[in-house]
Structure formats: structure tokens, C-alpha cells
């Protein structure tokens, strides 16, 4: 997917224009819920259909699997990721689309066990909140597997 960078003072206020009517899953961390950013975004656009805020630092497959099962039946067309590198990486994991909604398919794609051409990606709008690895512009995600 090509990357387009948009920046500017108060650019978040234009988020509805970028969502463009698509059913959106918002992925963030609990801190942004507590600070009121999620409520602000919901006021800016009516297209947020669900919020995932339990992304931990250094996301692990086992944690993402639990969240995957929570969202697998949500019919979203876009992911809005607001947070640091861990949130952006988790969003890339959830963007791997498969018709059967099977977790193992997604894990195998991420681990490189299946050809990357066999799937499509759900688009992501990333709003990075930290200066870090540049996760918002790369196709890679760091997902930890402490069991292997």
C-alpha cells in the first residue's frame, strides 16, 4: 500500500475527510482513552464503529489472538491507529484480511509461513504519537512470540 503523509497543526480535526465514510475500527492504547482523545475522535467522525484499546507495549501473538477473536466479526473497512509503535504494529497485524476470519491465517502471514501475495490488507490511517521507528511508513510490524 502506498504511504501518504499528511501533517499540520490541528490536522486531526479533518479526520472525517480522510475516513471518507468508511466503517472504521479505532485501535489505540488505554492511555488515550483516559486522556479523552478517543472521545474527541468520536466527536469528529460518526464512522468509528468500535474501539480496541488494550494494546500493550511490545505486542505478543498471544495477546493479539485474544483481541483478534473480539474483532473478527466486526465489519470494518478501515483501521484508524492512534498511538506509539506498538499500537501501529498491532494495527498492521489486524489489517491482514481473510475471508474466513481465521486467526491462524493471519499469524502465518505475519510469521512468513504463507506467501504475502495471498491476502489483501485493510487500509490503515496511522496517527503516530511518539518519535520512534517510523512504523507509520513501513510495511513491517514487530510482534513478539515468547513461546517460540
Predicted regions and their residues:
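Short Gly/Thr/Asp-enriched flexible loops that form oxyanion-binding sites at enzyme active sites
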Residues: 87-100, 137-138
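Acidic, glycine-rich active-site loops and adjacent beta-strand->loop/helix elements
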Residues: 58, 86, 97, 129-132
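ATP/NTP phosphate-donor binding region
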Residues: 1-78
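N-terminal loops that bind phosphate or other acidic moieties
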Residues: 73, 94, 112-113
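Fold-independent oxyanion-binding glycine-rich loops
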Residues: 9-10, 29-30, 82-84, 127-130, ...
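A glycine/threonine-rich phosphate-anchoring loop and its flanking beta-alpha core
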Residues: 100-148
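Hydrophobic/aromatic beta-strand patches that form the interior of the parallel beta-sheet core
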Residues: 50, 80, 123-127
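Glycine-rich phosphate-binding loop
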Residues: 77-89
Amino acid at each position: 500500500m502506498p504511504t501518504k503523509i499528511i501533517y499540520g497543526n490541528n490536522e486531526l480535526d479533518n479526520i472525517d475527510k480522510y475516513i471518507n465514510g468508511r466503517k472504521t475500527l479505532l485501535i489505540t492504547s488505554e492511555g488515550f482513552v483516559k486522556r479523552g482523545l478517543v472521545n474527541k475522535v468520536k466527536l469528529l467522525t460518526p464512522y468509528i464503529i468500535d474501539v480496541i484499546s488494550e494494546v500493550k507495549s511490545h505486542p505478543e501473538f498471544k495477546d493479539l489472538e485474544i483481541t483478534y477473536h473480539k474483532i473478527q466479526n466486526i465489519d470494518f473497512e478501515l483501521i484508524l491507529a492512534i498511538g506509539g509503535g506498538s499500537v501501529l504494529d498491532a494495527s498492521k497485524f489486524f489489517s491482514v484480511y481473510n475471508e474466513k476470519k481465521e486467526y491462524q491465517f493471519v499469524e502465518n502471514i505475519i510469521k512468513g509461513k504463507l506467501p504475502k501475495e495471498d491476502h489483501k490488507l485493510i487500509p490503515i490511517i496511522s496517527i503516530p504519537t511518539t518519535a520512534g521507528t517510523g512504523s507509520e511508513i513501513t510495511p513491517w510490524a514487530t510482534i513478539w512470540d515468547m513461546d517460540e
